Every structure is written in structure tokens, then in C-alpha cells.
Amino acid sequence: MRHVLLVDLGTGNTRVALADSAGTIWDMRTYTNSYYRDDAYEDAQYFLPAEWEERILRGCRELCEAHPEIRVSAVSSAGARQSFVLLDREGKAFYGLPNIDNRGRVFMDQVPDPEEVYRLSGKWCTEDFGAAKLLGLRQRRPELYEKISQVTSISEWIGQIFTGRTVMEPSQACESQLYDIRERRWSDKLCRAYGVDPAILPPLENAGAVLGPVLPKWREALHMAEDAVFIVGGADTQIALRQTEIRPGDIAVVSGTTSPVVTLMKEAFYDPRQRVWTDANLRGEGYQVEMNPGVTGLNYQRVRENLYGDWTYEELEAAYEQKTDFACTASFSSLLFYQRRSLRKGGFFLPSPLGAGVDRVDLIWAVLADIACSIYEQFQNLSDLTENRAPAILGCGGGFQSRALCQMLADLSGRELVLRPGFEQATVQGLIQLCDETMGEPSLHADGTAIRYTPRKEQLIHRYYPVWLENRNHANGVC
């Protein structure tokens, strides 16, 4: 039995976990990620790598000190997609460009031949990806841009901290929009389109590869095994999907801050209408075709904190079970993916005048139903476009801890929803599996039986969906 330290860098928070090769999570620390606004842009945010590094290493120290009997054999990490760290000539991380940074938005019309960009990268031209962030940085923060020696993703940045080597995994490289998904290498043509010097792009390294031995200063400080190594992880979505045991032809949903709906394909998928993103899978082996309703789980979390901070999640679930009608609809998801458009207008939609019977449960249930409807809409379009007709939906991520959400999605889709043991911490479980493969440990999975939600007919969510769709579309001018 071996033990591993795992770093899971999300959008809202970062988790550091101590786990063993059998899939048991011994202990965990969670930290809220801090961001700052850059006033040189209308919508730009950044983070300070030194702040994040201090918290991550503190978490590692606390875990190792709390379990002195354990000697860690390996470290690995997964990170949010579209999030990058800039390194200077001394190898110091000096600036972070997170996925929520939109500094490149006003410069996207400078990018030539967007059709070719989509064909090569699998993604339409948008401010979401690393290339656009670098373009925006060069335009208004040249003093920062000129400091760049190398760029890496936040997951491989952890590897740089622990080993001194800078690389990028293909699942993260494709999020830069500078990676050719078919050739599986950095693209000179994409670099020229965005004005990026290819010299700042690091070597590619596959998930599961040993990046190198852990530096002595960290091995000694954390009382690790003498032969402790860092194992390359990758993008958090692709890592989490390992936990679902997804195979080509399956469709899965990762329910978290956002809720990507994905299917795996052996060959690169091209849609001339650009209704999907095609991502590189781990190691560049195969492709992940994606639609995404945008922000979902974060909406529910915020409404709960504001309206129901005094209720537990379990109490809310019990209240949902009693509902037989709905008083309003909600629309807070942020993307109509298959139309390549953001949904800028949202809120609660209620009849006028306001009915006396409307209460807080009606509002928060509507937000949960909004998530289910938004995921279902993406699922249906992805299934039709790719012709992947799997009999079940595979699910993972903390959002699926809501029984009501799970049942709504099963009912709407008419397909069984399957959650395998450990789905709540899917990214950590995916990293454990990856480390086990590299270290030659038996392939074990978290204990327990899969949870299955069987679809039902003529449920409340079936009456809600057409009203939700009409209200959402009317508010946003969707045809």
C-alpha cells in the first residue's frame, strides 16, 4: 500500500488530499482561491502564484504532520482548465491567468481566420483560452508580457514546484488554443494567429509520466519516502472522468461550478457549425467532445447561502420531495453552447401579481431545476450531433450529491443516471487511479455500490421544462 499527496486546483477553491492506493482519502485541506481585478481591462482577473503556493504547501505540511506514520511515495495534481501560470527567466511563477479572466475579449477581432483556428484547436475563437489571455496581456500589460520565459497550466505548475521541471499535459495544452489536436503538438500557425512566441511553450508530457524526483527540500520537509516522485496529472475534467469509467460512445456529466457534458471519441470530431468543443483527452489519446451550460453549481451555492443558510442540504432535499407544483422558473446558467452565445439575462420568472403562496423553497427548487434543464438541453444536443446513444448517463462531481438533481436529470433524459463510488471527489479519485497505474499498484476503486437513478414519466420536472425554456428564451431573445 502506497500513499500519495494530491492537489486539486478548482476555480473556487483548492484541495490538498492525502490518500492511499486503495482509493481511501485519509485527510484533506481546502482553501478558498483569491483573485484580484486588473483595472486596465473591463473584465480581467488574476491571481498571485506565491499566495496559492503558500497555501498548498501549508496544506501538504499539515497533512503529513497529522499522519506522521505515513511516508508519501508520490505527488500529483489536477487543475481547472483554461488557467495558466507565467514564469520568469529565473523560473519563478509571477502571475496567474485564471479561467475567469476575460482580458482578451476586446481583442478577439484581431485573430485572423477563426475557421482555421477552430479546425486546428477544436475550439472557437473566444477569450476563454490561454492564447486570448496572452494576447490581452501583451496589448495592455507589456511590462508583464515581456517578463514571460515560460507558460504552464496550473496543474503542471505544481509539478514545477516539486521538481523544478516545467511541462504541460496535452489535456491542458489544448486549453491554450495553441495546440493542434490532430497533430498532438504545439501549432506554429496558431501561435502566429495570436502573436505568441512558441519559445514560451514548454515541452509536452503525458499524464502518468514521472516528471522527476521530488526536490530534496520538499521530500525532507514533508518526510516523504526517499524515492518520492511527482506524477503528471492534467485537466480536472478529464481526470475526474476517469472515476466514471467512461468509454468511447458514453456520455458523462461533471457537475460542479460548471457542468460539462462530454462524450469520448477515438477520432477528432469536427462540426462546421462550431457547436461543440473538441478537447484532447489525457495523453492526447482520443478526444473529448463537449457542450457546457456554463455556470450552474455556483448559482445554487450562492442562492442557498443567501436564502437558506440556516438549512442543511439534507433538509432542503426533504423539502424538495414534498413539492407537487412550481410557482416560478429560474434561469441562471450562462451559456447556450450550441448557439455559441452567452446568456446575459437571468433571474426568477413569476406570474404578476406575486402570489401569496410563493416561498423560499419555490425559489431554490427552481434554481436546481434550472441546472437539470440546462444540463439536459446540452445532453440532448450533444447526443443528436455525435449520434452517441448510450443507454445511461455517467455522472460525477459534487453537484450530484443532490438526489433531487439526479432524479430530475434521469427523468428529463429518459436515461438511467449512474454514479460510481467516490463520485463526490471524482478528481481526487481519478488522480489516485493515475498514480496507481504509474506505481504498479493494483487497480482498486472506492468501496461501495454504484448509485442508479431510474427515469420516471409525468413528473413535475416534465411540466417545468417547457415553461422554463419559454421564459429563458424570451428573456434572452433566443429563437
Q: What do these predicted regions represent?
A:
Residues 64-99, 124-128, 155, 159-180, ...:
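Short beta-strand-loop/turn "lid" adjacent to the catalytic site in phosphate-handling enzymes
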